[in-house]
Amino acid sequence: MTVDIMRLPKMEDQTAIQEAASQGLKSMEHLIRVLSNRPEERNVDCSEITDFTVSKFKKVISLLNRSGHARFRRGPVHSPPSSSVPPPVKVTTPAPTQISAPAPVSFVQANQQSVTLDFTRPSVFGAKTKSSEVVEFAKESFSVSSNSSFMSSAITGDGSVSKGSSIFLAPAPAVPVTSSGKPPLSGLPYRKRCFEHDHSEGFSGKISGSGNGKCHCKKSRKNRMKRTVRVPAVSAKIADIPPDEYSWRKYGQKPIKGSPHPRGYYKCSTFRGCPARKHVERALDDSTMLIVTYEGEHRHHQSTMQEHVTPSVSGLVFGSA
């Protein structure tokens, strides 16, 4: 679609422009004649003539800006000849270039001006120029020239490196292709196994999916010692439990399916930090009997040893000679 712009000025606008321009030119000539005379012969005020001249030229400018409004007309649409078969697209692939392997250790010193490396051209990697400061990255070595700064190089929008040192990158290792023809997803974490617990019986030996340095082997569940006894209930109250040689503190309860009496959970409060637990519930066959299940072992000897050692250590005074 073409658009033709046509300027059609009106006749009256052209006449007004010509009149204003002629008056402005005449007043400007008169002002020049007045200014060309000698100062003692000047009897006319030049400010009025100047204002009149400027006003006429301003009028000309306003008329020129106002005249000549554009009109748009839609031109004929030139449709290309339709063809049933599209033209064949010719695809050209660049010839493979031989990539030269970098030396294990290389220090290149250059005093000349550095050149620009364009990453879009495949033939740049095969040639090395002596006038550029080279930064090489290889699997076996990593060398940077002493006069170059890798961080100061600016990468332009087309992929070229300018105002810095040229870079020669080692070829990347081949990405393994799966049976479906697509490379594996890079977002999957590297699954590794903890070498400390590889042959340990205390761990399940399953591999972990996270890549941080902590061990994520699943610990096997310890078999706690459980002992169940049936004792007669002291009273009908749930909080009343038969006493034994230890003191217990209730820390929760849980309803039992099919029983109106909940199960109470207790932990040993004889010594702080004792891992022994027990839970008490009513027997389903006989409501006058209680089923007490003990879990864990009492560790009161270690707690008493710590209580005796702690005040003795705190009472020591270290003096300097």
UniProtKB/Swiss-Prot annotation:
Disulfide bonds: none
DNA-binding region listed in the record: 237-303
GO biological process annotation, one example: defense response to bacterium
SUPFAM superfamilies given in the database record: WRKY DNA-binding domain
Region Disordered, annotated ranges: 71-91
Primary role: Transcription factor. Interacts specifically with the W box (5'-(T)TGAC[CT]-3'), a frequently occurring elicitor-responsive cis-acting element.
Localization per record: Nucleus
InterPro entries tied to this protein: WRKY_dom (IPR003657), WRKY_dom_sf (IPR036576), WRKY_plant (IPR044810), Zn-cluster-dom (IPR018872)
Name the record gives this protein: Probable WRKY transcription factor 17
Keywords: DNA-binding, Nucleus, Transcription, Transcription regulation
Sample GO molecular function, one term: calmodulin binding
GO cellular component, one term: nucleus
Predominant cellular place of this UniProt entry's protein: nucleus
A Pfam match: Plant_zn_clust
